[in-house]
């Protein structure tokens, strides 16, 4: 069943139709929240709040918009409100433990991949919230610039500019971290290198 059909049924009072929408989007909404707030427990709460808000305001949803865009907008607003109220940008957490490593990777390759993910998440947390959101929506969720502009407001051109700025800033953070590591290697790394 399509989102349009599920929304129409849910707006008519069909609770199982809304539950189907929740099942369809819960992983994406949780992943988005987790990347924005860096706390798996808070992300779960924010995902639940997102679906609660969607349920409460479902009758005001207009079918001329996409449900996916609308629910992402609610999730982004929930995350922004959380970040504003708590004024915190915690340490990055690999929230949903999505395995990005191939099945044939060696333990060394898997360790490097996990370390790279942690570095990227740490750099991502340094970005302004809007750039975090644009990058997450584009890369993780695969939204187009048009869809991002519908979720965050603004134009597709502004979404593209924010995305490009976010990538540029992210690269700068990652390069500066690499330079820092090269200038001040960890004692464990220095010990491993000296043994060879």
What are these regions (language model features)?
Residues 8, 12-15, 87, 103-136, ...:
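Amphipathic alpha-helical segment used for protein-protein interaction
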Residues 9, 91, 122, 146-153, ...:
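C-terminal edge and immediately downstream basic/flexible tail or linker adjoining helix-turn-helix-like DNA-binding
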Residues 11-12, 38, 51-66, 85-87:
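Sigma70-family region 2
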Residues 11-20, 30-49, 156, 176-180:
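Short, charged helix-capping/linker segments at alpha-helix termini
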Residues 31, 45-52, 65-77:
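Structural recognition of an alpha-helix C-terminal capping motif at a helix-to-coil junction
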Residues 59-63, 73-93, 113, 165:
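Arg/Lys-rich amphipathic alpha helix in sigma70-family domain 2
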Residues 69, 76, 80, 131, ...:
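DNA-recognition helix of helix-turn-helix
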Residues 89-113, 188-191:
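Internal acidic/polar
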